[in-house]
Design a protein with these regions (language model features):
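Positive-inside N-terminal membrane-insertion signal
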Residues: 1-23, 197, 203, 231
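Individual transmembrane alpha-helices with interfacial aromatic-anchor signatures
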Residues: 55-59, 155-170, 201-205
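Generic alpha-helical transmembrane segments of integral inner-membrane proteins
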Residues: 19, 23-30, 213, 217-221
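Amphipathic alpha-helical segments and their boundaries
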Residues: 14, 22-69, 84, 88, ...
Length: 232
């Protein structure tokens, strides 16, 4: 009978140990699967937002570049406007980059609105209006000074330059600061995403390590009981 009792006690101990280990493994597995799913979902959503911010920053930087080129082409008009062919060439380029600047800033406005960044969208809208006003002022001044002539003389070019000198400076600075602000936003979003993913990874890792340690302790305890049961 004593051997039978020992055998039953050993079986109960082994069964209890197996059940405990099964529950621990199942718990670790389920939590790990949920954590991986959660991390993956957060990563996908965060990456999507980061990509949108990168697109926003590229549009702002493109607007900054295209406006600088537009201003440079205006200077070329004044410097080389005494040649009809060059005047036509630089006028076309001036208008093309003016349109490109408008499109880039408008894209920033649209994407900022989609992201719920209403302050940036409002700021972009103001830049669009200011740019339109300055471009129109360039064009009107040129037409009036040119007075139907096929070229721009050096004297006329100097008068135009004096009347419009520095008119682009505030807008260029505003677009530059605007672009820098958006780039900083994009960098912060990327850094925040990386930090969140790192925190979740560390949480999952330490949980698994803790459960494994706890499992080893439980296993050692159950095995100790099993050994004692075989000796009594």
């Amino acid at each position: 009978m004593s051997n039978i009792h020992k055998s039953l006690a050993l079986r109960r101990t082994i069964s209890s140990s197996a059940f405990t280990m099964f529950m621990l493994v199942a718990m670790v597995g389920l939590f790990s699967l949920f954590s991986i799913w959660s991390i993956n979902r957060a990563w996908i959503e965060g990456t999507k937002h980061t990509v949108q911010m990168d697109s926003l920053s590229r549009a702002a930087l493109d607007a900054q570049v295209s406006f600088k080129v537009q201003v440079q082409e205006w200077k070329n008009i004044l410097l080389r406007g005494d040649d009809p062919a060059l005047l036509e060439k630089y006028l076309k380029s001036f208008h093309a980059h003016a349109l490109q600047t408008q499109e880039n800033i408008s894209q920033v406005k649209l994407e900022a609105s989609v992201l719920g960044m209403n302050d940036l969208a409002s700021e972009a809208e103001k830049l669009v209006d200011t740019h339109k006003s300055i471009t129109l002022r360039y064009e009107t001044t040129l037409v009036e000074a040119q007075a139907g002539a096929a070229v721009i003389s050096a004297t006329v070019a100097r008068k135009i330059d004096v009347s419009l000198r520095g008119v682009d400076r505030d807008l260029e600075n505003s677009i530059g600061l605007f672009a820098d602000e958006i780039v900083d936003f994009a960098i912060q979003e990327r850094s925040s995403l990386e930090a969140r993913m790192q925190d979740r990874y560390f949480t999952l890792r330490w949980f698994i390590i803790s459960v494994i340690g706890f499992s080893l302790v439980i296993t050692a305890y159950v095995l100790t009981r099993a050994l004692r049961a075989t000796r009594t």
